[in-house]
Amino acid sequence: GKNCTSRSGAVIGGEPQDDDYDGEATRVVVGGNCQIHEHVTIHRATGEGETVIGNNVRMMAGSHVGHNARVDDYAVLVNNSAVGGHAHIGERVILSGQSAVHQFCKVGRLTMVAGSCMVTRDVPPFSIITDTHPLRWRSTNKIGLQRNGFESDERDAVRSALSKLFVNEINRDSVAEELAQSDYDSVVEIAQFVRSSTR
């Protein structure tokens, strides 16, 4: 992409750390206006597919994106955060320092992952996630929602939806079915995320 910066020691398109990789000609696609800081590594894909970095992504020193992963627009990977192979990081997600996302996991848009947190399951949009064992939903990303134009009534609806999901983890499917009937697109997005989750 245009207008990207890459600092010293960054490696973009290196061979993936995957035993299934057999030398195939795969690639990394980087969008525009990205900031790639010192010693960042972005591995190209294994097999078919691509490793994709969206537009306006900021990857701070030592952060890593594994093979076949996708990082959407405006995401921020803070120092030494890592994204495993085939993982999907949603738009405007913040991965705090030393955090990691396990392979094949999805992190929904406008989510903030706390420092040193290990994400081993899919995380719905608009969340703040802390701890590791077990992964714990702390709250709605209220500041992120405010900064992105969500009115107070919609923020309240998102908070209520996420609270229902995390209180009723055993009945997530029935909660998702209820949320899918919401008048708010953001709440419907949460329901769709849960329904499509595989982890």
Predicted regions and their residues:
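Structural signal for interior beta-strand "rungs" in well-ordered beta-sheet cores
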Residues: 1-135
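Terminal amphipathic alpha-helical/low-complexity segments used for targeting or macromolecular assembly
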Residues: 3, 9, 14, 20, ...
